[in-house]
Amino acid sequence: MVALSVEVGPWTGCAVLFLRSCPAVNLLSLYKDQQGKFSVFKVLKLTLTDSAGGLEGYEILKLHDADPLLGVEVKFVDVAACRRFLQSYGSGAVQQSLSQHTCRLLHIPQQELALETQLKAGTHTLDFCLDDLELCLQHIHQSQPERLRDDEIAELDQQLQSQALGHIPQPPTLTQEEPPVPSNCFLFQKRVFEDRMLAAGDLQRFSNGVGRDWRKVGRALGKNCRALKGPAIDNLAYEYEREGLYEQAYQLLSRFIQAEGRAARLGRLVRALEDSKLTSLAENILDIQPRD
């Protein structure tokens, strides 16, 4: 009955996404700064567009100063958009999109940005029940918005729409940004690549080339993958110690693919390799010829 109750009639609900970023940029501090406010809002709006499947079904009501966290209060008016957002959040795609847009718009190297997220609806921390999507939807539905959209958010949204239509230039305080990368692609060395699902060839190249750094890559992947958190990597190392480095690396990436399913995509692996300073291996997997 719970699953049906969230589907019928007008549906609204509210959730707050809490963000913490370091060390290269503090999103809360940047939002408090007049010159950085618009850029932070644009990062958040693009992330929501990616994760909720478009521009409809939700709106940002207010950004909260929850020092050291930045709270993004979102009102959902469509259960399908809310479900897509929850699925994206649970798979790590929200954090991935947030990281991509932050680095692109604020010109920050990927390896210098660390992000932490938490999703709440009322008193419920949804990170603890993401495996039960209907329960998350119920908590969000029960958490009704207590305010109208903040005037400042409305002004920023209007500014973003005007910029998209070409009515105003990019704010002079920021370097002119590159054309937006499609949500099904990722950027590496200023080139756009299709963000496809990982394949057997990727698994073999990774296992052949990563060597002793497989644990480092595993920890980078583990930032957004529950199956690789805690003692999981050390357990893999112990379990496959006799089989050698190739098998340890192979089992690591296999476990990532099994756990993440359709969210186990090439862009996440390339980003983990960048974070681990293994750019040459990323180039190998992407078939990029090394520079002389």
Swiss-Prot record:
<feature type="short sequence motif" description="Nuclear localization signal">
    <location>
        <begin position="215"/>
        <end position="228"/>
    </location>
</feature>
<dbReference type="GO" id="GO:0005856">
    <property type="term" value="C:cytoskeleton"/>
</dbReference>
<keyword id="KW-0539">Nucleus</keyword>
<dbReference type="GO" id="GO:0005737">
    <property type="term" value="C:cytoplasm"/>
</dbReference>
<dbReference type="InterPro" id="IPR000488">
    <property type="entry name" value="Death_dom"/>
</dbReference>
<dbReference type="GO" id="GO:0043123">
    <property type="term" value="P:positive regulation of canonical NF-kappaB signal transduction"/>
</dbReference>
<dbReference type="InterPro" id="IPR011029">
    <property type="entry name" value="DEATH-like_dom_sf"/>
</dbReference>
<comment type="subunit">
    <text>Heterodimer with tnfrsf1a.</text>
</comment>
<keyword id="KW-0963">Cytoplasm</keyword>
<dbReference type="GO" id="GO:0005068">
    <property type="term" value="F:transmembrane receptor protein tyrosine kinase adaptor activity"/>
</dbReference>
<comment type="function">
    <text>Adapter molecule for tnfrsf1a that specifically associates with the cytoplasmic domain of activated tnfrsf1a mediating its interaction with fadd.</text>
</comment>
<protein>
    <recommendedName>
        <fullName>Tumor necrosis factor receptor type 1-associated DEATH domain protein</fullName>
    </recommendedName>
</protein>
<dbReference type="GO" id="GO:0005634">
    <property type="term" value="C:nucleus"/>
</dbReference>
<keyword id="KW-0053">Apoptosis</keyword>
<dbReference type="Pfam" id="PF00531">
    <property type="entry name" value="Death"/>
</dbReference>
<dbReference type="Pfam" id="PF09034">
    <property type="entry name" value="TRADD_N"/>
</dbReference>
<dbReference type="InterPro" id="IPR035712">
    <property type="entry name" value="TRADD"/>
</dbReference>
<feature type="short sequence motif" description="Nuclear export signal">
    <location>
        <begin position="148"/>
        <end position="164"/>
    </location>
</feature>
<keyword id="KW-0206">Cytoskeleton</keyword>
<dbReference type="GO" id="GO:0097191">
    <property type="term" value="P:extrinsic apoptotic signaling pathway"/>
</dbReference>
<dbReference type="GO" id="GO:0002947">
    <property type="term" value="C:tumor necrosis factor receptor superfamily complex"/>
</dbReference>
<dbReference type="InterPro" id="IPR009095">
    <property type="entry name" value="TRADD_N"/>
</dbReference>
<feature type="domain" description="Death">
    <location>
        <begin position="199"/>
        <end position="289"/>
    </location>
</feature>
<dbReference type="InterPro" id="IPR036729">
    <property type="entry name" value="TRADD_N_sf"/>
</dbReference>
